C-alpha cells in the first residue's frame, strides 16, 4: 500500500545486491537461505539452539483480540502496517496504548518510509537511535525501518 505500485521486485533486488556487497556477506544466514536453501551453520540463530528452554507461547490471530495486551513488555509487528490504512493503524495505536509504561513496540517496515509515530505519539515516544542502528546492522536486509516506540 505505501510502496509505489510495481516497485517490489526492484526493491527486493536492490536490497539483496546491497546485502551481497556488505563485508562478510557470505556469513549472512538470510543470504545463505536465499541462495543455498539452508544455513551453513547450525548456530546461525543462537537462540534457536539455546540449552535453556525458551517457553514462548504461540499466539495466532489479530493482536486486537488479545485480552491481556497490558501484560506484554514487547510487541513486535513485522510489515503489519505496510499495507494498512491510517484508520487501521489508529485503531492499533489506541489498543496498544493499554500497554504499561516502559513497554515497547517494534515496527518493521518494508518498502515504506511512513513514520507511524505521528499516529502513536499520544501514547508512545520513538527511540530514533534504534532505527538508525538497525538500518546499519540488520542482517535480514529487507527492512527500510525498524522502529522502536516506548510507552509513555
Model region roles, listed by residue range:
Residues 88-104:
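A short glycine-rich, Lys/Arg-flanked "PGG" loop and its adjoining helix->strand segment in the class I
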Residues 1-50:
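Class I S-adenosyl-L-methionine-dependent methyltransferase module
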Residues 129-152:
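Core SAM-dependent methyltransferase catalytic element
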Residues 47-66:
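Adenosine-cofactor binding site in Rossmann-like domains, unifying the SAM/SAH pocket
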Residues 116-124:
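Short, aromatic/basic amphipathic alpha-helical patches
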Residues 80:
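Hydrophobic adenine-recognition pocket in adenosine-nucleotide-binding enzymes
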Residues 64-76:
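A short acidic, Gly/Pro-enriched loop at the edge of an enzyme's catalytic core
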Amino acid at each position: 500500500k505505501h510502496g509505489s505500485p510495481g516497485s517490489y521486485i526492484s526493491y527486493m533486488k536492490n536490497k539483496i545486491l546491497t546485502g551481497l556487497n556488505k563485508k562478510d556477506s557470505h556469513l549472512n544466514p538470510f543470504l545463505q537461505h536465499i541462495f543455498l536453501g539452508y544455513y551453513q551453520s547450525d548456530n546461525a540463530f543462537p537462540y534457536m539452539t539455546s540449552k535453556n528452554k525458551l517457553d514462548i507461547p504461540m499466539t495466532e490471530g489479530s493482536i486486537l483480540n488479545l485480552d491481556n495486551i497490558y501484560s506484554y513488555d514487547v510487541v513486535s509487528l513485522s510489515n503489519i502496517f505496510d499495507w494498512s490504512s491510517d484508520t487501521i493503524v489508529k485503531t492499533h495505536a489506541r489498543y496498544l496504548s493499554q500497554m504499561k509504561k516502559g513497554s515497547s513496540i517494534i515496527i518493521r517496515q518494508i518498502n515504506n518510509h511512513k513514520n507511524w509515530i505521528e499516529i502513536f505519539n499520544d501514547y508512545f515516544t520513538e527511540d530514533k537511535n534504534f532505527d538508525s542502528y538497525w538500518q546499519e546492522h540488520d542482517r535480514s536486509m529487507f527492512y527500510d525501518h525498524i522502529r522502536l516506540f516506548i510507552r509513555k
